[in-house]
Swiss-Prot record:
InterPro entries hit by this protein: Ribosomal_eL30, Ribosomal_eL30-like, Ribosomal_eL30-like_sf, Ribosomal_eL30_CS, Ribosomal_eL8/eL30/eS12/Gad45
HAMAP family: Ribosomal_eL30
GO molecular function: RNA binding; structural constituent of ribosome
Gene Ontology terms: cellular component: cytosolic large ribosomal subunit
Protein's recorded name: Large ribosomal subunit protein eL30
DNA repair keyword on record: no
Amino acid sequence: MRRRSSMDINRAIRVAVDTGNVVLGTKQAIKNIKHGEGQLVIIADNCAKDVREDIFYYTQLSETPVYTHQATSIELGAICGKPFPVSALLVLEPGNSAILNVNNEE
């Protein structure tokens, strides 16, 4: 089985942002996860430890999968087409993207 390259994952994230419904930012992601919304959380590699712990706590309660991207928050923001850092994003609807097929196995 072929592992997904970071370019495939980056493309899937961008397609999800462009065609689906995605929430950007840690505060909004956590808020939506608490309400049981979302299908996948993607966090940047350099996401703050306390925020990362909060995200993992609430995703365990809601059984929402988490993918830790190997990009920094600045790079993740650029992947999303935004001029600001993005430490976390929550995929509510993937749109035309195959982002939900991503796994965290390295």
